[in-house]
Amino acid sequence: MNQLLREVLTPDAERTQNFTVGDTVKVHYKIVESGKERVQIYEGVVISVANEANGKTFTVRRVSYDVGVERIFPLFSPKIAKIELIRKGKVRRAKLYYLRNLAGKAARIKELKGGKALVSEDRKRQQAAAATKSTTTE
């Protein structure tokens, strides 16, 4: 069954997981309000990645008006328009649930050395994937 799902859901260049736990990402999520579809951007730190293959999910945490907000996104959801990598974080844990108990400067994550180069490579890869996608649809 998993093999069938892998064949149906072939990961394209935009959809491959280009982030890990501790990275700051912007998730462009499509929502429908009163019959209109718009894209909402949710920016935060990835605190966990769960499951495997087609059911893979990731949890993004951000602090909004002094309240921590976490949202779980399925990686292969058709409602996700784009996942944009903002910065690479240096962490030594697979799950960052301890960030829930921290506030302010204590909740910061150090940036990975060479992270800016990785972010720029990711942007170039996404632009190239978008360009090839637009040429194939025309």
From Swiss-Prot:
GO annotation (BP), single: translation
Keyword annotations from UniProtKB, A to Z: Ribonucleoprotein, Ribosomal protein
Cellular component terms (Gene Ontology): cytosolic large ribosomal subunit
Keyword flag Ribosomal protein: yes
Molecular function as annotated in GO: structural constituent of ribosome
Keyword Ribosomal protein on entry: yes
PANTHER family found in the cross-reference section: LARGE RIBOSOMAL SUBUNIT PROTEIN BL19M, RIBOSOMAL PROTEIN L19
Function noted in UniProt: This protein is located at the 30S-50S ribosomal subunit interface and may play a role in the structure and function of the aminoacyl-tRNA binding site.
Family affiliation: Belongs to the bacterial ribosomal protein bL19 family.
Record-linked HAMAP family: Ribosomal_bL19
NCBIfam families: rplS_bact
Name of this protein: Large ribosomal subunit protein bL19
